[in-house]
Amino acid sequence: MFKINIITAFPEVFPGSLDVSILAKARQKKIWDLNTVDLKKCTSQIHSIDDKPFGGGPGMVIRADVLQNAYEKAKIFFKDYNFENVEKIMLTPNGEEFNHSTAEVLAKKKGLLIICGRYEGIDERFIEYNNLRKISIGKYVLCGGETAASVISEAVLRLLPDVLGNEKSRLEESFVNDMLEYPHYTKPRVWNNLLVPEVLLSGNHKEIRKWRSEKALYFTKKIMKKNKKNDS
C-alpha cells in the first residue's frame, strides 16, 4: 500500500479531491492511504505554531520545534516501512519545479511525507536537519502548501498500478515522452457547425495513429514556444 502523510495547519482541507472518482475507489481497494498531522496539536503553546522572523520583515515563520514534533509523529504512519523509501517533501516556491517526470519517480517510492508551508515560511533549520526535498508546483505563490500537496498527491497516485481503469490511457496522455496529448472528440459528429476530423471516423487505425502523432507534436511545439516566450 502506498501511503501519504501530510503535515499541515489545516487538516480539514484533506482528503478533498483525493477522495472522489478513481482515487476514492483505489483507496477503498487499499491501493493507497492518507493521513494528516495537525501542526496545531504539535505545540506546547495553545495554537501557537509560528513566531516573528529573526532579522525583521513581514509575516510569521512556522517554528522548527513545532515542525519537528509533527515530523516525528508523522513517522509513525510509516512504522511498517523502511523510512528511507519514503520521499520527504517540503512544499515551497523556491523548490525544484514539479513535473510528470518527478511524479513518475515519486510513484516508485513506498510513500510520501509532505510538509505544507504557511504564512511567511518555515524555519530553514527544520529543512536542513531532516534533509527534505524542496518542491514547487509552479512559478507563483499560494497562501499555503495544501493545494500543492493535493496536486502532487493526485499526479503520483494515478501512476500507481491498478489505479486507472485503463493502463493504456496512462501511456498515451500528456507529458509521457515529453509530448502533449492529441485532441479528443466524441458525439455528436456535428456541433455548432464544427465537424469531427474525418480521419477519426475512417476506421483506418494507421492513419488515425499518424494524425494523433502529428497533432501531439504540433501542440507540443506550440506550447513550448509560448512558454519560452513567457519565460523571456
Predicted regions and their residues:
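N-terminal nucleotide/polyanion-binding subdomain common to many enzyme families
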Residues: 1-75, 206-223
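Hydrophobic/aromatic beta-strand patches that form the interior of the parallel beta-sheet core
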Residues: 5-7, 35-37, 87-89, 112-113, ...
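Short, solvent-exposed amphipathic alpha-helical segments in soluble enzyme
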Residues: 21-25, 104-108, 129-130
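A short acidic, often aromatic-flanked loop/helix-cap motif at beta-alpha or helix-coil junctions
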Residues: 40-45, 96, 141-144
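Short clusters of hydrophobic/aromatic residues that line enzyme substrate/ligand-binding pockets
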Residues: 49, 54, 98, 106, ...
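S-adenosyl-L-methionine/SAH cofactor-binding core of RNA-modifying enzymes
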Residues: 61-118
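Structured adenosyl-cofactor binding patch, chiefly the S-adenosyl-L-methionine
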Residues: 122, 126-175
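Long, charged alpha-helical interface segments
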Residues: 175-231
